[in-house]
Each structure stands twice: as C-alpha cells, then as structure tokens.
Curated annotation (Swiss-Prot):
Function according to Swiss-Prot or TrEMBL: Prolactin acts primarily on the mammary gland by promoting lactation.
Family indicated by similarity: Belongs to the somatotropin/prolactin family.
Gene: PRL
GO biological process: female pregnancy; lactation; positive regulation of cell population proliferation; positive regulation of lactation; positive regulation of receptor signaling pathway via JAK-STAT; response to nutrient levels
MF term (GO), any: prolactin receptor binding
Quaternary state and interactors: Interacts with PRLR.
Keyword vocabulary terms for this entry: Disulfide bond, Hormone, Lactation, Phosphoprotein, Secreted, Signal
Protein name, per record: Prolactin
UniProt modified residues of type Phosphoserine: S52, S116
Annotated source species: Alexandromys montebelli
Length: 225
C-alpha cells in the first residue's frame, strides 16, 4: 500500500471514529473527579492522552467537514494557507527532534500550545456560529473542542505539577495578531481565514497528542515502549 493510500485510509478511520464518539455523546472521563486528584502519574498521562486524542479527532473531523463545504478548489487552498500564529513557538518538527528536548521543557511547550488556543477557540465558536450556511456538525464540534481544550489544559498542568513542580510557570504564549476578528469582511476572506484557523487547530492538536504520547513513554515507561 502506498503512503498516500495509507494516509487516506487513516483519515477516513479518524472521521468514522470521531463521528461515532460524538454522535453517541461519548466524552473522555474527567481528569479529576470533583477536583480530587489522587492519581498516579501514569493514570494522569493515560487520561490526558485520551482527551488529547479526542480533541485531535474532533479537530480533524471539523477540518474535513469545512474543507468539503468551502474549499473544493486548489486555488482557494493555496490562498488560504498561511503560517499559524503558534509557529512562533519553537516546537520540535519530528519525533527524533522531540526526543532531544528535556521532558520538562517539552511539557511546558505543550502547555503553551494548548493555552494559546483558549481565546482563539472562543472566537472560533462565535465566528462559525455566525455563518448562516455552516453545518450543525461544524458548529457542534467547534463548541465541543473549546470545552475539551480547557480540560486538556487542566490535565497538562497537573502532570507538570506532579512530575516537574519546579518547572511550572516557564511556558511562553504566542500572540494571535494574525487572526483578527472576522466581522465586517467579505465572505471569501472570512472563509479563507476560517479555513486557515481550523487547519492550524488540527496541526497543533496533532502535535500535542503526539508529544504527550512520547512523554508518557519517556517519563512513565523509561523509554521502554
């Protein structure tokens, strides 16, 4: 099987799984019950990774849905793609590079990525909800991702506090000057900006999910996985 064919099958499987979870109203377990967090580090990692993967699946699903409805031609996609604002964060490009980053530094980078999306996700929900022709699927997923991102942030903070308490407070947040409000702009510009924002969300949520899995292997399993 070619890599391209494998990628297509993986994307389709991701879409099916995301739809199944969302339609059945299946959500990841809370990070901590009633604020009481008597968990081992492995339990915290397992629960946070379940949540990060859910957020990534929802983001990928929303991107596929938006692309299907608004980005059918190559010219649109070429005009839409710009750098993501979080590109200012010096995140590793691949697994080998991530392995060279100290775990406490990588955890703070993950925390920075997730925290940097809090405000833009709230803005995204408002913008998508204001598009009359937007599908219920896109609107619902935007709202769900916004809620789950807050829980993901809480979980990563708990991991950092338990594993490396001395490293807390070292995160750096990106500035979102590239994603101004979409009010008052023409329809094409709005669609281009939304496409890029959702694309960046998918990219960053995938990074977070992969980094967390890598860190679980390094910290919990001592690289024996």
């Amino acid at each position: 099987m070619t890599i391209q064919g494998s990628d297509r099958k993986g994307t389709l499987l991701l879409l099916v799984m995301s739809n199944l979870l969302f339609c059945q109203n299946v959500h990841p377990l809370p990070i901590c019950h009633s604020g009481n967090c008597q968990m081992t580090l492995q339990e915290l990692f397992d629960r946070v990774i379940m949540l990060s993967h859910y957020v990534y699946m929802m983001s990928a699903d929303m991107f596929i849905e938006f692309e299907k409805r608004y980005a059918q031609d190559h010219e649109f996609i070429a005009k839409a793609i710009n750098d993501c604002p979080t590109s200012s964060l010096a995140t590793p490009e691949d697994k080998e590079e991530a392995q060279q980053v100290p775990p406490e530094v990588l955890l703070n980078l993950i925390l920075s990525l997730v925290h940097s999306w809090n405000g833009p996700l709230f803005q995204l929900v408002t913008e998508v909800d204001g598009i009359h022709e937007a599908s219920d699927a896109i609107i619902s997923r935007a709202k769900e991702i916004g809620e789950q991102n807050k829980r993901l942030l809480e979980g990563i903070e708990k991991i950092l506090g338990q594993a490396y308490p001395e490293a807390k407070g070292n995160e750096v947040y990106s500035v979102w000057s590239q994603f101004p409000s979409l009010q008052g702009i023409d329809e094409e510009s709005r669609d281009l900006a939304l496409y890029n924002k959702i694309r960046c969300l998918r990219r960053d949520s995938h990074k977070v999910d992969n980094y967390l899995k890598l860190l679980r292997c390094r910290i919990v399993h001592n690289n024996n996985c």
